């Protein structure tokens, strides 16, 4: 499953996870996704201090391509470009051993003209243009048989710098690279000794190089970088390498060495955002892009210079890396993933936001998001140079629906007109009345680009399903004002688009080739207005660039529905149940639930698309007061004003938090709706300990529990288990955590003993039973944590205890909470059966555990009349019922019999 496929299948995952439910249950488990195991976890917090790692970014004109420069400017922004790489040529002998030839001067002028598109006063590094290494590019005057003439080579470099200083004094030459990829002998430049001698001559015999740096050999294979750096000391002070071959270890270690030496870490030919992330992590200060792809690189350059890195992770075995950055000016956050251009392998990353619900490219609310990076099978085999960026959004105004694959109308904000394909030479905007039926030319199929499309795959294709023609920027233009037409260029880069959420349900739509914005041409007409691409507009003109993706049957209108009313919040043992009165508008499609801290700060969208007038918030933390409000959203994605706000908090009593009885369902039977989700259809067996059925796990399945189910100072986890794969060690009965550095788990066997372990980044703290968990028969097991003591219980008897466990579950704040699965990739899944799994927010006593074990139905004993009225009462569907209700109900988070 690739990240693109993730976009397509998220809804399917959610649907399959919810499939066992017998009714619509509006709680956080609607959004809980049971992601498969990932190789690397990337935890981050949007509120973290983070690390600022600014980089001097640049573009390359050694490969002279004006389109690359224009793309780089549009995506990176001129303000973020501080350097460029140009080239001197060895193709002709110097005139009189001192002066550049006309052809050499012409190429410097052409390259400088391209640099001038960025700025007329940009710093420049001059690099050797070796071409293909033939005599056409390297004249024997300079080198022959891979042996250089250092004196002539030095004179050539000096003459090239002198020409630039004379003709372009505003461009400062700050460094020179005597050879390009010198470790690749077919280039026929010269030896390491030749390189050092050239550098020595420049520094000792040419005064103009007193303040111009010499870069070390920019090796093709980074395994050779240290040799071509150490071998040119002390004359070369800029460490430099490419990453077209070589190990991850030597790449990282090279940058660390340059930094440790007090020299300048410089990469003059970057090919992938993954390579850039890794180099930045280990110290690179200046990076120049060879060629230029588009979005991921541009956004990484922008945010790295204006923001803070919140997380970084790498997979050296697959030559990939990932990171999360926050723009400190706008608050926007982005996740990046990339790898080696020629050596990356398939890899998986799980981005984890333990303390806040977020949205990844509009998917959410989520605390965890898994993506798959598409690598190759060997060096330059199956490689696509893949890279990807995700928008991470949160707050009061997030995407109102995820933009998944499907058919849409695209409505402009300013005119409420629709994008329409007319003929084969123009795309225009037509205006319709709000209820008009769209024509075939008004419908667009949105699909994520293939992750193997080549390079950056952070895009969509936008296609008219009737004609098969795509939104296409005419002639691959990178200029503002270029027409957008219906065409079929086989999903080329000028037919790929990406979205940026702009608020109020509207998006910017930007082109991969140009980075410019889909826009209505300025026109007083209200229909048949041509659509173009444009730079970002301002003021009232901005509406011409704002678009909304509407369902085909939705009206084209922007009138907000009436707000919901009567919002109430009922405290429960580990949740707040919200109820409200529906909006009076008939076309209201769903509701959005927002929550803030008690002081009114930090509003966030904790649920959206709710097709009911109630919601159970079980992502609230114990003992914490919140403010809530609800918004109505209609079919056209217009949002109402919010309801009046209320204040609420979960209850403070010692009570049950969740109960999973597995009677044909993995739903929680408490009022907290801590419903589990499964990556496959759950299986049940009649060999049960409590009730008629138990959850059957065959070593391939597992359950994921809601994010906040284990976030407590004290707790009890109690369950019945029948363990059948007893030949395997390190299976899990439960494992709550955030990866392999934060967890608490119970394993039936570590090889010799049943063990409870808890870890919060430091040393693991454990409690062992004297033996393994008994196999092939039902037994009750519990872990109690509280009062400074952790105890393991088996069939109501304490079998292990410790007062030396100082870590509390709330210290970990676990969100990856599993039954039958480990945080560790290599640990086997549990095989056997589970029944009557319960979690309490306090440590049960031995007497309470024995009472629990003796309840064969999993239902509490009938309560006295006076205790009945103390707390609200709910039926098993979660709806509140009157005190006169008879039968099995839920009160204070547990089942009770009402007589």
Question: What do the PLM-derived regions correspond to, one by one?
Answer:
Residues 617-638:
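Beta-strand-rich modules
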Residues 398-557, 677, 702:
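Lectin-like carbohydrate-binding module/patch detector with strong preference for beta-trefoil
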Residues 574-588:
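Conserved aromatic anchor
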Residues 633-652:
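Extracellular fibronectin type III
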């Amino acid at each position: 499953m690739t990240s693109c496929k993730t976009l397509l299948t998220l809804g399917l995952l959610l649907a399959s996870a919810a499939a066992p439910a017998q009714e619509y249950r509006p709680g956080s488990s609607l959004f809980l996704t049971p992601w498969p195991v990932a190789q690397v976890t990337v935890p981050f917090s949007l509120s973290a201090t983070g690390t600022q790692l600014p980089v001097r970014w640049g573009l390359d004109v050694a490969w002279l391509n004006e389109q690359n420069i224009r793309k780089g400017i549009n995506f990176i922004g001129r303000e973020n470009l501080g350097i460029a790489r140009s080239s001197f040529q060895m193709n002709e002998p110097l005139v009189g051993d001192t002066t550049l030839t006309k052809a050499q001067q012409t190429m410097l002028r052409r390259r400088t003209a391209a640099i001038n598109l960025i700025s007329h006063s940009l710093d420049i590094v001059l690099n050797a243009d070796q071409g293909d290494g033939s005599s056409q590019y390297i004249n024997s005057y300079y080198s022959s048989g891979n042996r250089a003439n250092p004196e002539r080579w030095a004179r050539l470099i000096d003459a090239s710098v002198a020409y630039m200083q004379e003709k372009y004094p505003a461009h400062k030459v700050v460094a020179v690279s005597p050879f390009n990829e010198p470790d690749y002998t077919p280039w026929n430049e010269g030896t390491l000794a030749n390189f050092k001698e050239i550098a020595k001559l420049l520094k000792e015999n040419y005064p103009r190089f007193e303040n111009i740096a010499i870069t070390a050999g920019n090796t093709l294979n980074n395994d050779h970088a240290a040799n071509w750096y150490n071998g040119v000391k002390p004359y070369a002070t800029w460490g430099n390498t490419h990453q077209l071959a070589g190990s991850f270890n030597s790449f990282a270690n090279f940058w660390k060495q340059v930094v440790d030496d007090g020299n300048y870490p410089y990469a003059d030919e970057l090919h992938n955002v993954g390579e850039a992330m890794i180099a930045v992590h280990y110290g690179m200060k200046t990076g120049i892009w060879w060629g230029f792809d588009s979005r991921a690189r541009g956004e990484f350059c922008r945010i790295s210079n204006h923001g803070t890195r919140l997380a970084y992770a790498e997979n050296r075995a697959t030559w990939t890396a990932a990171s999360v950055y926050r723009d400190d000016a706008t608050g926007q956050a982005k996740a990046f993933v990339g790898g080696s251009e020629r050596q990356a392998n398939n890899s998986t990353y799980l981005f984890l936001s333990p303390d806040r619900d977020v949205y990844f490219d509009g998917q959410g609310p989520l605390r965890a998001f898994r993506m798959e990076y598409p690598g190759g099978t060997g060096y330059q085999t199956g490689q696509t140079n893949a890279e990807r960026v995700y928008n991470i959004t949160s707050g009061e105004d997030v995407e109102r629906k995820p933009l998944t694959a499907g058919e849409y109308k695209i409505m402009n904000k300013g005119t409420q007109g629709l994008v329409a394909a007319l003929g084969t030479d123009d795309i225009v905007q037509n205006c319709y009345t709000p209820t008009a039926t769209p024509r075939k030319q008004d419908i667009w199929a949105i699909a994520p680009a293939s992750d193997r499309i080549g390079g950056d795959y952070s895009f969509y294709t936008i296609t008219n399903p009737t004609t098969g023609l795509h939104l296409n920027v005419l002639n691959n233009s990178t200029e503002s004002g270029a027409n957008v037409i219906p065409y079929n260029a086989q999903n080329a880069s000028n037919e790929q688009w990406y979205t940026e959420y702009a608020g109020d349900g509207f998006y910017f739509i930007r082109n991969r080739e140009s980075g410019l914005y889909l826009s209505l041409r300025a026109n007083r007409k209200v229909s048949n207005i041509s659509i173009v691409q444009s730079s970002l507009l301002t003021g009232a003109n901005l509406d011409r660039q704002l678009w909304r993706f509407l369902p085909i049957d939705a009206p084209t209108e922007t009138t907000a529905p009436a707000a919901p009313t009567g919002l109430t919040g009922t405290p429960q043992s580990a949740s707040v149940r919200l109820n409200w009165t529906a909006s009076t508008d008939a076309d209201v499609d769903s509701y959005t639930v927002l929550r803030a801290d008690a002081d009114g700060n930090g509003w966030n969208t904790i649920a959206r698309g709710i097709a009911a007038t109630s919601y159970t918030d079980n992502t609230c933390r114990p003992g914490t007061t919140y403010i809530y409000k609800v918004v109505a959203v209609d079919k056209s994605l217009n949002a109402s004003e919010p309801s009046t706000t209320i204040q609420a908090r979960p209850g403070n009593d010692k009570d049950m938090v969740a109960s999973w009885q597995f009677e044909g369902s993995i739903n929680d039977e408490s009022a907290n709706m801590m419903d589990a989700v499964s990556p496959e259809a759950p299986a049940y067996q009649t060999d049960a300990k409590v009730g008629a059925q138990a959850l059957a796990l065959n070593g391939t399945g597992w359950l994921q529990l809601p994010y906040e189910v284990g976030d407590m100072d004290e707790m009890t986890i109690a369950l019945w288990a029948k363990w059948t794969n007893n030949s395997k060690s390190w299976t899990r009965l439960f494992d709550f955590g955030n990866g392999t550095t934060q967890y608490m788990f119970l394993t039936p066997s570590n090889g010799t003993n049943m063990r409870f372990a808890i870890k919060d980044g430091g040393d693991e703290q454990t409690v062992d039973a004297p033996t393994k968990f008994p196999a092939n028969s039902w037994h009750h097991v519990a872990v109690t944590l509280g009062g400074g003591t952790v105890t393991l219980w088996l069939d109501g008897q304490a079998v292990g205890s410790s007062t030396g466990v100082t870590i509390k579950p709330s210290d970990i704040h676990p969100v990856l909470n599993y039954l039958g699965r480990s945080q560790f990739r290599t640990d086997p899944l549990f095989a056997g059966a589970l029944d009557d799994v319960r979690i309490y927010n306090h440590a049960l006593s031995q007497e309470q555990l024995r009472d629990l074990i003796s309840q064969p139905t999993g239902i509490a004993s009938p309560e006295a009349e006076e205790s009945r009225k103390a707390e609200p009462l709910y039926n098993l569907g979660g709806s509140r019922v009157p005190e006169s209700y008879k039968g099995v109900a839920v009160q204070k988070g547990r089942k009770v019999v009402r007589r």
